[in-house]
């Protein structure tokens, strides 16, 4: 069936409110505290249900909070997708990790040349971009291989973990180095610098110069001392300035010709810029004063097709995702988001497919250039809505997928007032989108990829809560008379439900289920 044969409403708009979780808790809940007349009306008058967006429901370990990458993979995939975190942890448990060909080959090169192995990675138990147990497993593997010079360049979290929580991970890995009698943490830097994904290359340059030249704002004898120094400066883990760890009479440990680098982040989006700085022969984003000629550069997972590195855990291929399935049937699609979430409504929603499918257009709205988004909680939501309303009225597309980044990106700052303002901006944008849809006979499914903004303070740590949550997320249908089933669904049910509303059978690859019945 093509859209020409289908009399279902057009366009269908899938609206993803990034970081918008459901919680009965009203204290420190920016969503409940915000003035949201549009959302209140939608929940009162339109069918809605709740979806699981964490743990096993999205291919993660029990209790592991969801994230944007995983959320969009499941929304677009319509099936349970084993996540890299789960795959790599399983490989460690089974022993396969210690026989991984890409890792073994790189380590053997370092051993043969008597060169150093430099481990880059987010040293964090967060499980969103990395997990510290996996870094520890690589340290163990390097030790087993007889590597004498093992250096960890620790990127600190404080975003998917409490703002000041890095010490435990630092102490654990330091104890491991001491037990082996070789290796050390060579540098510290906050993810704000080392893991930018919005082409703020001045931040990436600071990380690159720390790694290749030892250019540091601070120097410390130990990693713990370096962390305490950052806290004294008023910085939380995320914002730790470039810090070199070495004795006062020694030169900083840097990545040199012949060395091996292993980047231990399993999530690609925030690992790409730093990787390009090392590997791109035509790199122009900043002037690389030093470019080491490496024996090997290994990435834990595949970061991008144009990044030519050995990959320890290649991606699983997904076929007949929502985008691919609709494309094959001649449907026209649009993906629209601002910079911070553009990859999620394109690459991740398409199951790791970089190029658009036939009939799929993409529109990128630039995110504002501010240090942190609490300074501009509206981000680019209004500009995106202006374009979206215009596009809806032009009636060019069968399916439009858009992502509002504000609840997640502002929620990550831990600023409750700013996050509340962000929610209120989104509420006003939703009103305009729904009004435009109803004027042309279109419909909407509104959901989220994971929670965040509904929990802004952590009573246990007595710190602002900047991480995602494991809460359920909403699914609201704005269209014809319908009823959701009583059971709680999951994110992989969104695509089958959407296809049902568009008058289509789901493909056999989609194991998620339709959650709604039209009356």
UniProtKB/Swiss-Prot annotation:
GO terms for biological process: carbohydrate metabolic process; glucose catabolic process; glycolytic process. Substrate binds at residues 129, 159-160, 191, 197, 267-270, 341. Gene3D superfamilies: Alkaline Phosphatase, subunit A, BPG-independent phosphoglycerate mutase, domain B. Pathway: Carbohydrate degradation; glycolysis; pyruvate from D-glyceraldehyde 3-phosphate: step 3/5. Pfam families: iPGM_N, Metalloenzyme. Its cofactor is Mn(2+). GO terms for cellular component: cytosol. Its EC number is 5.4.2.12. Mn(2+) 2 binds at residues 18, 68, 449-450. It is an enzyme of class 5 (isomerase). Keywords: Glycolysis, Isomerase, Manganese, Metal-binding. Belongs to the BPG-independent phosphoglycerate mutase family. NCBIfam families: pgm_bpd_ind (TIGR01307). This is 2,3-bisphosphoglycerate-independent phosphoglycerate mutase. It comes from Coxiella burnetii (strain RSA 493 / Nine Mile phase I). The gene is gpmI.
């Amino acid at each position: 069936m093509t859209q020409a044969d289908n009399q279902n409403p057009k366009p269908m708009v899938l609206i993803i409110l990034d970081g918008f979780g459901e919680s009965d808790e009203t204290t420190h809940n920016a969503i409940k505290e915000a003035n949201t007349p549009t959302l209140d009306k939608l929940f009162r008058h339109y069918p809605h249900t709740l979806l699981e967006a964490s743990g096993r429901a999205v291919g993660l370990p029990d209790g592991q909070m969801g994230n944007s990458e995983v959320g969009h993979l499941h929304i677009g995939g319509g099936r349970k997708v084993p996540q890299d975190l789960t795959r790599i942890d399983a490989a460690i448990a089974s022993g396969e990790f210690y026989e991984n060909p890409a890792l073994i080959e790189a380590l053997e090169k370092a051993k043969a040349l008597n060169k150093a192995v430099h481990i880059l990675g987010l040293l964090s138990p967060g499980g969103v971009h990395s997990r510290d147990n996996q870094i520890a497993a690589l340290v163990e593997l390097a030790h087993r291989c007889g590597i004498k010079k093992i250096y960890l360049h620790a990127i600190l979290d404080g975003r998917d973990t409490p703002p000041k929580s890095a010490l435990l991970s630092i102490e654990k890995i330091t104890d491991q180095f001491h037990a082996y009698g070789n290796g050390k943490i060579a540098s510290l830097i906050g993810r704000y610098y080392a893991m930018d994904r919005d082409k703020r290359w001045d931040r990436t340059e600071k990380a690159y110069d720390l790694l290749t030249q030892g250019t540091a704002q601070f120097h410390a004898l130990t990693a713990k001392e370096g962390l305490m120094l950052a806290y004294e400066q008023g910085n939380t883990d995320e914002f730790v300035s470039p810090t070199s760890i070495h004795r006062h009479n020694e030169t900083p440990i840097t990545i040199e010709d012949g060395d091996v680098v292993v980047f231990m982040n399993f999530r690609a989006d925030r690992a790409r810029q730093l990787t390009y700085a090392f590997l791109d022969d035509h790199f122009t984003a900043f002037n690389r004063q030093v470019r080491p000629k490496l024996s090997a550069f290994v990435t834990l997972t595949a970061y991008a097709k144009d990044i030519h590195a050995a990959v320890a855990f290649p991606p699983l291929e997904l076929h007949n995702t929502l985008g691919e399935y609709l494309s094959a049937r001649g449907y026209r699609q649009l993906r629209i988001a601002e910079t911070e979430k553009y990859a999620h409504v394109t690459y991740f929603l398409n199951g790791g497919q970089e190029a658009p499918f036939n009939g799929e257009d993409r529109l990128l709205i630039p995110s504002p250039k501010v240090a942190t988004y609490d300074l501009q909680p509206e981000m680019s939501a209004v500009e995106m809505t202006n374009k979206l309303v215009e596009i809806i009225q032009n009636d060019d597309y069968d399916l439009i997928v858009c992502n509002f980044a504000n609840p997640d990106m502002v929620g990550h700052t831990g600023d409750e007032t700013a996050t509340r303002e962000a929610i209120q901006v989104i509420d006003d944008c939703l009103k305009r989108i729904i009004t435009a849809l109803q004027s042309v006979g279109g419909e909407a499914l509104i959901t989220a990829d994971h929670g965040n903004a509904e929990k802004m303070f952590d009573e246990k740590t007595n710190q602002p809560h900047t991480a995602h949550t494991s809460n359920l997320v909403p699914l609201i249908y704005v269209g014809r008379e319908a009823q959701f089933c009583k059971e709680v669904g999951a994110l992989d049910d969104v695509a089958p439900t959407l296809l049902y509303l568009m008058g289509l059978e789901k493909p056999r690859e989609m194991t998620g289920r339709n959650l709604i019945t039209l009356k």
